[in-house]
Curated annotation (Swiss-Prot):
Top-level taxonomic group: Eukaryota
Protein name listed in UniProt: Ribonuclease homolog
Signal peptide boundaries: 1-23
Positions that bind substrate: K65, S66, F67, N68, T69
């Protein structure tokens, strides 16, 4: 009986490890990829995007992420959207927040981005009561 419990515990731990390593979004991933508060200062939006995309690992291993949005608000303003929400719920803010959209304009020899700032509503996907996915923005 004890051996059976140990076996199932090992299987469960393996499954959890695999799910964490292979694409299950986490709150920490969300913060790292999309949140920049207070906004890091650069002389232009393009300079901001070129540096931030590298800093946040979106240009690693010879690949350039084609598009990313950074949100410039306290993460708690987005966390409240996901309280008591089912996993994979999509929620949109009522308020507008300052964001920067970074769009790839050249990938060779190095990744280069244009940047545009907007005030937008933010739509997030929830898991475990926290935002884990930026699903988009709207005017």
């Amino acid at each position: 009986m004890a051996m059976s419990s140990l076996w199932w515990t090992a299987i469960l731990l393996l499954a959890l490890t695999v799910s964490m390593c292979y694409g299950v979004p986490t709150y920490q991933d969300f913060l790292y990829k999309h949140m920049d508060f207070p906004k890091t200062s650069f002389p232009s939006n393009a300079a901001y995007c070129n540096v931030m995309m590298v800093r946040r690992g979106m240009t690693a291993h010879g690949r350039c992420k084609s598009f990313n949005t950074f949100v410039h608000t306290d993460p708690r303003n987005l966390n409240t959207l996901c309280i008591n929400q089912p996993d994979q719920a999509l929620r949109t803010t009522r308020r507008h927040f300052r964001i920067t959209d970074c769009k790839l304009i050249r990938s060779h020899p190095t990744c280069r981005y244009s940047g545009n700032q907007f005030n937008r509503r933010v739509r997030v996907g929830c898991r475990g009561g926290l935002p884990v996915h930026l699903d988009g923005t709207s005017p």
